[in-house]
Amino acid sequence: MGIKIEKGVNKNNIELLCSWSNELGSVFQEQWMGTQVSYPLTYEKIEKLENKFSIFNEEEFIGMIQEVRIEEDNIHIGRFVLNPQKTGLGFGTEALKEFIDFIFKDKNIRSISLTVFDFNKNAKQLYDKLGFVVDEVIETPKLKYIMKKHR
């Protein structure tokens, strides 16, 4: 397994993301995109996202992750998705470890936060495993957690 994170997502890979997401439907899209991006996913909707990164295993594009916003000494990440055929194989763990290491290279960043829906059990398990802890619980409109990892 040779996971690499690279800034940006090219046109062909954006089209792959749309295909993976749209095939699995609106609930899947909400899991990884949140509620601010309407279904179905299109090239234009992903293209508009800033600070997005490609995830590769060796040379194969397998997913995307985003630095959503900077909040003083915290970076909020999200929109983390893998090719559905690559889940459950350790790629998500390795990709998130790489992204965490990349972010923490900036010594001014003290923490990383993310939001996860309660129904997205596999993602929450991954975040727990990598040291994220629940920082805030949001109960409406759908139960979700803001989780945070400190340096």
Predicted regions and their residues:
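A short, internal acetyl-CoA/4′-phosphopantetheine-binding micro-motif in the GNAT/acyltransferase core
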Residues: 80-91, 116-117
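Conserved beta-strand segments that form the floor/walls of ligand-binding pockets within enzyme
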Residues: 76, 81, 113-115, 146
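Conserved beta-strand-loop-alpha-helix junction that forms the acyl-donor binding cleft
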Residues: 114-124, 140-144, 150
